[in-house]
């Protein structure tokens, strides 16, 4: 077993405390303020206080008047009260392909898109990117304490398992590796998690069902990984998918990342695909046929994580993992943010036939959402697509798209920087202010715009929010008893897979052997 650090250890020299707005729960008024140590709450930025107005309040006063902003928030709040998530969750999950929900923007859908986007953002906030850390490439927190360590309280979800992938594939700009010789794993990276909504009555009342959520890590702003893609489609049926059509193809790099494994590594001796399918199967068997229990499967991810979200959502449906023992079909939805194209037109058609719903949130200026397949894609003339459909570089987006434009936000610089336009926190900010085509940009939930600069330099300078401000105190270094600065040890990572994983895999590939 490897050792993974616990970030409950705090520097002896630091006694700073910061106020954070902490919850996955959607809100439309001033957020509840809870005091947490700044070191243990990297996922959230400072919220509004009575003593000092936030930058969002100041901008509202400067731009369009606080009364207008408060009126819009009040209107959204009233609309949300009249149409609660528990009563409309199937439509929010795409039952009708989100018809009539995006223009004007439905406040419940907006709230859910932000909530699932924050689940994807948690993968960034918890990931150890530091090459000078011997734990680089791992999650900084144990799964039982993931949300608490990020300062996210009342999430309503419990992390069921962590996901790992082997780095022995040709995506060098995606994986992070330590410069230390003795590391937690030489060939694995943490990729995300599978979570399930808890038994709390408030959670069940709010969601209206039990939700299995899969969150994939992507890339914060670096776009070099796009150049690593082979831009070559290959049949999914050759990678263990139970697909009857050999013409259904996906980008080979995404397939490799999802299906490859390294039997010499405890963390990735099972592929990310096998880890996801077996855990979802376990949860479906546990909850799927409970009387009065409704279930949903929601997959989320940003950037390359968005590609994995689409691929795994398709896989869950293709393999029939979303069917209970009694034959009930569980809806599968993917919410992606700045995700690239994944497969060809036959892949798109197959996803639609399986009933998988995909909603893609994109910044119109984001190049990743236009890749791969820059020239041969769903926007090409239909006649050309029919002729070129069999070519290994002819791609098609799937599902529905919600296009946003960062130049509409009065908070953000009108930059043309490609990596900045790809930022997930910026997308969540744009979601918060979007009310429909041609409508004024007004923040609806009070989500703090300072979060945008957590890992970017996107906010206008006069708001005085430093760029790239999110970091651990003293970059994670602490003083030991001798007064020397060291990296603290972390709690051991759980590199043991479930004891019944082989049995579950057998059942997946040979359904007749179901017990």
UniProtKB/Swiss-Prot annotation:
Protein's cellular compartments: Plastid, Chloroplast
Keywords of this entry: Chloroplast, Hydrolase, Lipid degradation, Lipid metabolism, Plastid, Transit peptide
Entry-linked InterPro entries: AB_hydrolase_fold, Fungal_lipase-type
Reaction(s) catalysed (UniProt annotation): 1,2-dihexadecanoyl-sn-glycero-3-phosphocholine + H2O = 2-hexadecanoyl-sn-glycero-3-phosphocholine + hexadecanoate + H(+); a 1,2-diacyl-3-O-(beta-D-galactosyl)-sn-glycerol + H2O = an acyl-3-O-(beta-D-galactosyl)-sn-glycerol + a fatty acid + H(+); a 1,2-diacyl-3-O-[alpha-D-galactosyl-(1->6)-beta-D-galactosyl]-sn-glycerol + H2O = acyl-3-O-[alpha-D-galactosyl-(1->6)-beta-D-galactosyl]-sn-glycerol + a fatty acid + H(+)
Predominant location: plastid
Enzyme kind, highest EC tier: hydrolase
Record has Hydrolase as a keyword: yes
Keyword Protease in annotation: no
Gene Ontology MF annotations: galactolipase activity; phospholipase A1 activity; triacylglycerol lipase activity
Effect of deleting the gene: No visible phenotype under standard growth phenotype. Decreased dinor-12-oxo-phytodienoic acid (dnOPDA) formation.
Gene Ontology CC annotations of this record: chloroplast
Active site: 303, 366, 422
Transit peptide feature range: 1-44
Tissue distribution: Ubiquitous. Highly expressed in leaves.
EC number: 3.1.1.-
Family: Belongs to the AB hydrolase superfamily. Lipase family.
Its biological purpose: Acylhydrolase with a broad specificity. Catalyzes the hydrolysis of phosphatidylcholine at the sn-1 position. Moderate activity toward phosphatidylcholine (PC), monogalactosyldiacylglycerol (MGDG), digalactosyldiacylglycerol (DGDG) and triacylglycerol (TAG). May display dual sn-1/sn-2 substrate specificity. Could be involved in early wound response.
PANTHER family cross-referenced by the UniProt entry: PHOSPHOLIPASE A1-IBETA2, CHLOROPLASTIC, PHOSPHOLIPASE A1-IGAMMA1, CHLOROPLASTIC
Protein name, entry field: Phospholipase A1-Igamma1, chloroplastic
Species this protein is from: Arabidopsis thaliana (Mouse-ear cress)
């Amino acid at each position: 077993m490897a050792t993974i650090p616990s970030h409950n250890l705090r520097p002896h020299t630091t006694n700073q405390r910061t106020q954070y707005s902490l919850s996955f729960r959607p809100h439309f008024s001033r957020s509840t303020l809870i005091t947490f140590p700044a070191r243990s709450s990297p996922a959230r930025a400072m919220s509004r206080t009575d003593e000092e107005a936030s930058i969002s309040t100041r901008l509202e006063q400067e731009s369009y008047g606080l009364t207008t902003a408060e009126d819009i928030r009040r209107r959204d709040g009233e609309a949300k009260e009249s149409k609660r998530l528990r009563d409309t969750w199937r439509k929010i999950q795409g039952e009708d392909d989100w018809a009539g929900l995006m223009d004007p923007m439905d406040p419940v859908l907006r709230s859910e898109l932000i909530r699932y986007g924050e689940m994807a953002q948690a993968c960034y906030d918890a990931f150890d990117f530091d090459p000078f850390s011997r734990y680089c490439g791992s999650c900084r927190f144990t799964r039982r304490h993931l949300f608490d360590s990020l300062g996210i309280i009342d999430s309503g979800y419990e992390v069921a398992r962590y996901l790992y992938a082997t780095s022995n594939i040709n995506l060098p700009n995606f994986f992070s590796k330590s410069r230390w010789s003795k590391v937690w794993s030489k060939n694995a990276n943490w990729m995300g998690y599978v979570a399930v909504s808890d038994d709390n009555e408030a959670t069940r009342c709010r969601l209206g069902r039990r939700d299995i959520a899969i969150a994939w890590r992507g890339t914060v702003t670096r776009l070099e990984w796009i150049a690593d893609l082979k831009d070559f489609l290959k049949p999914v049926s050759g990678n263990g998918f139970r697909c009857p059509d050999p013409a259904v193809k996906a980008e080979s790099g995404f397939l490799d990342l999802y299906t490859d494994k390294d039997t010499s590594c405890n963390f990735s001796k099972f592929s990310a695909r096998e880890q996801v399918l077996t855990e979802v199967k376990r949860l479906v068997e546990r909850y799927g046929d409970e009387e009065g229990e409704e279930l949903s499967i929601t997959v989320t991810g940003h950037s390359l994580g968005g590609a994995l979200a689409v691929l795994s959502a398709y896989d869950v449906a293709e393999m029939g993992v979303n069917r209970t023992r009694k034959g009930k079909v569980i809806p599968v939805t993917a919410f992606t943010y700045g995700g690239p194209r994944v497969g060809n037109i036959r892949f798109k058609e197959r996803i639609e036939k399986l009933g998988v719903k995909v909603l893609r949130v994109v910044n119109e200026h984001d190049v990743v959402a236009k890749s791969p397949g820059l020239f041969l894609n769903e926007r090409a003339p239909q006649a050309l697509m029919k002729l070129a459909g069999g070519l290994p570089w002819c791609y098609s987006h799937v599902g529905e798209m919600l296009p946003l434009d960062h130049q509409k936000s009065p908070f953000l610089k009108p930059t043309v920087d490609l990596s900045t336009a790809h930022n997930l926190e910026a997308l969540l900010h744009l979601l918060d202010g979007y009310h429909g085509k041609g409508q004024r940009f007004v923040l609806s939930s009070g989500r703090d715009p300072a979060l945008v600069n957590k890992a970017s330099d996107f906010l206008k300078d006069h708001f005085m929010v430093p760029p790239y401000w999110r970091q651990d105190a003293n970059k994670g270094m602490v003083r030991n008893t001798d007064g020397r600065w060291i990296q603290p040890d972390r709690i051991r990572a759980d590199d043991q897979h479930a004891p019944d994983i082989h049995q579950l895999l057998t059942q997946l590939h040979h359904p007749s052997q179901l017990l």
